Amino acid sequence: MKLVLAIVLILMFLSLSAGAETSDNGVSRGGHRPQYWPVTPPSIVCLRSGEDCENNTPCCPGLSCRVSADLATLKLSLACD
């Protein structure tokens, strides 16, 4: 019984140490943390009137609008037809 317990403990220790090595190697290879999108949503601007649109406010009343996104500046634009 003691032999089985010793083997289980050794296997657990080896698996923990092997996991630590692989995670350390991944950090040293990467060299930087990944960049994430900001928490706040991007702003939406109506192209015809130039006004900011918030939540469900209609920017271009009575006109059909297309939404375009500029990922570099995180801005969404509405083009009104």
Swiss-Prot record:
It comes from Conus litteratus. The presence of a 'disulfide through disulfide knot' structurally defines this protein as a knottin. The cysteine framework is VI/VII (C-C-CC-C-C). Disulfide bonds join 46-60, 53-65, 59-80. Keywords: Disulfide bond, Knottin, Secreted, Signal, Toxin. Belongs to the conotoxin I3 superfamily. The lineage of its organism: Eukaryota, Metazoa, Spiralia, Lophotrochozoa, Mollusca. Residues 1-19 form the signal peptide. Residues 20-42 form a propeptide. This is Conotoxin Lt6.4. Expressed by the venom duct. One of its GO terms (cellular component) is extracellular region. It is found in: Secreted. Its main location: secreted. One of its GO terms (molecular function) is toxin activity.
